UniProtKB/Swiss-Prot annotation:
Gene that encodes it: sepp1a
Family: Belongs to the selenoprotein P family.
Gene Ontology biological process terms in this record: selenium compound metabolic process
Compositional bias (Basic and acidic residues): 191-220, 326-336
Region Disordered, annotated ranges: 191-241, 309-367
MF annotations from Gene Ontology: selenium binding
Protein name: Selenoprotein Pa
Keywords from the named record: Glycoprotein, Secreted, Selenium, Selenocysteine, Signal
Keyword match Secreted: yes
Protein task: Might be responsible for some of the extracellular antioxidant defense properties of selenium or might be involved in the transport of selenium.
Species: Danio rerio (Zebrafish)
Cellular component terms per the entry's GO annotation: extracellular region
Signal peptide: 1-19
Length: 367
């Protein structure tokens, strides 16, 4: 019996003993065929490094990811990595199809596919989940299948995966790869690695020490993404929020890995509009305000809050026109950050909502 158990354990270690063995087995292989109508996106992209993001239009985090994907495209082109095909495949569930335009508005030079419901699910075909990003070489072979938290585009993992695929022939030689493309890659690498002339600086022992610490940290971070597909335990946060002035019920905020690194992004810093109060002279209470459209990806360390949510410790003032939704505990979900209620001497100034010019998505309502 122990002999059989040992053999089973050994086999588990060999194949990974997890759902990730399917992803590993797909590496350097052509993807299963999937279509959107009569279009075969992967065949059309042959000859280019291809990046496919699986996003959901009803997910606020996904919309932010879509915007950052545009930024990544421009960044890589400026660094000398052209001719990369980027595409996004929307989820086929009803809410995502209905809000397809929200995703489209955030993708400038990137093709967005709305699935044909009469055809097989394109996500299932490649074993993709929401927020996954897959990278393919010029011959259409899978080089990276990245999942949260490694697909957060403010982190370097996706960018590095694209660069490695572009330059390193991860799956061997490719007949669709030209010498000119490899020369482009060489130039881009040389440009990135070009030494930067340092300005003269005073020598301080503790500064030297700090520099080495940061260098070591960067080195650890650079090597930390070679196995980005482990940790697929997800937590789905579902709340009612206002997206583009359309109230959605039970919007899925995305999968958050249990071991996700915490990122502290204060709500006030990322607020998009504020309610202003004018106080009579002599008022000794602080001015109250409510900040809308908080863009906090994760809560404070160890608090277990769901991605995409912003919480307050005080109840929202009744006079605040922010579109936050209260729970019974008076916490505000996603769109608002609270301040203490305004003193009696304060009145709402006009206009009550200060939004960026031309911003139709501002969540404040005018009285």
């Amino acid at each position: 019996m122990w002999k059989a158990l040992s053999l089973t354990l050994a086999l588990c270690l060999l194949v990974g003993c997890s759902a990730e063995s399917e992803t590993e087995g797909a590496r350097c292989k052509l993807p299963p065929e999937w279509k959107v109508g009569d279009v075969e996106p992967m065949k059309n992209a042959l000859g280019q490094v291809t990046v496919v993001a699986y996003l959901q239009a009803s997910u606020l985090f996904c919309l932010e990811q879509a915007s950052k994907l545009n930024d990544l495209l421009l960044k890589l082109e400026n660094q000398g990595y052209p001719n990369i095909a980027y595409m996004v495949v929307n989820n086929r569930e009803e809410r995502s199809q209905r809000l397809h335009h929200l995703l489209q508005e955030r993708l400038l030079n990137i093709t967005l596919y709305a699935q044909d419901l009469s055809q097989p699910d394109a996500w299932q075909a490649v074993n993709a989940e929401k927020d996954d990003i897959l990278v393919y070489d010029r011959c259409g072979r899978l080089t990276y299948h990245l999942s949260l938290p490694y697909t957060i585009l403010s982190h370097p993992h996706v960018e590095e995966a694209i660069k490695h695929t572009y330059c390193d022939r991860i799956c061997g030689e490719c007949s669709l790869e030209s010498s000119a493309q490899l020369e482009e890659c060489k130039k881009a690498t040389e440009e990135v690695n070009k030494p930067v002339e340092e300005e003269p600086r005073q020598d301080h022992g503790h500064h030297e020490h700090g520099h080495h610490e940061h260098q070591g940290e960067a080195e650890r971070h650079r090597h930390g993404h070679h196995h980005p597909h482990h940790h697929h335990h997800h937590h789905r946060g579902q709340q009612q929020v206002d997206v583009d002035q359309q109230v959605l019920s039970q919007v899925d905020f995305g999968q958050v890995a249990v071991e996700t690194p915490m990122m502290k992004r204060p709500u006030a810093k990322h607020s998009r509009u504020k309610v202003q109060y004018s106080u009579q002279q002599g008022a000794d209470s602080p001015v109250a305000s409510u900040c809308u459209h908080u863009r906090q990806l994760f809560g404070g360390e160890g608090n277990g809050r769901v991605a995409g949510l912003u919480h307050c410790d005080e109840p929202l003032p009744a006079s605040u026109p922010u579109q936050g939704l209260k729970e019974q505990d008076n916490h505000i979900k996603e769109t608002u950050q609270u301040r203490p209620a305004p003193p009696a001497e304060u009145e709402l100034s006009q206009p009550t909502u200060v939004u960026p010019a031309g911003d139709a998505t501002u969540g404040u309502r005018k009285k």
